């Protein structure tokens, strides 16, 4: 009996140790070097009534040209698209970005990891962040994409695709319709990202404002920094430098920190992280 009890305790301790090491590894695994990173992170796929990704085409064209992606292969991640098929999502993105002159292939068309490994760039679409991260982990793409981007493979994300470029997905606006393995994401930009930021409360709304929701996160994670992107705002990342892009100079990037006033970062300004 004693031997069985010792064996059970030993196995339990070993399992606990493995879980502890696994958790630690998950946090450390995506902290790759940042010097070679090239990324364009859009708050959303649209701006007012300009159409799907139309407002971002000038930024995207410049990004493609600067990174010599014309005629190159782009791995598209469609996993956030819940209300449409992956085929339909791929077709929508191909049509919207036809003028870029890149070859877009969705990772659902084959073995996802192989498509990402052979791609010259990675584009991640918007939708539901929980399902996006859920599928990224199921297909073993989180660490792989983080590593490829650290090696200089250009990355473009919009909405959920921008949220997951941050340290974790915990400042998403989405419903938890799926349970991912972890909230840790690509950590390309080693802070929190909140896309689609809207200030205040609509008339008649008695729930929390976006500011209040983000404050809740900071209360529990006081060392974190959140960058909130209003509609029409984007982050252009080159190594450890960030340029703020935007459609409206009156709607700047916002920086939120624990027990500090919200600070505004002007459109067209640059900062190091």
Regions found by a protein language model. Name each.
Residues 3-10:
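N-terminal export leaders
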Residues 12-20:
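Bacterial N-terminal signal peptides
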Residues 24-26:
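Boundary at the C-terminal end of the N-terminal hydrophobic targeting segment
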Residues 30-70, 81-91, 171, 175-273:
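C-terminal and late-domain segments of enzyme folds
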Residues 75-127, 131-132, 137:
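Portal/gating segments that form or line small-molecule/metal binding sites
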Residues 117-118, 151, 188:
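Alpha-helix C-terminal capping/helix-to-coil transition sites in glycosyltransferase folds
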Residues 123-126, 149-168:
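Catalytic nucleophile loop
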Residues 139-152:
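Catalytic-core regions built around general acid/base machinery
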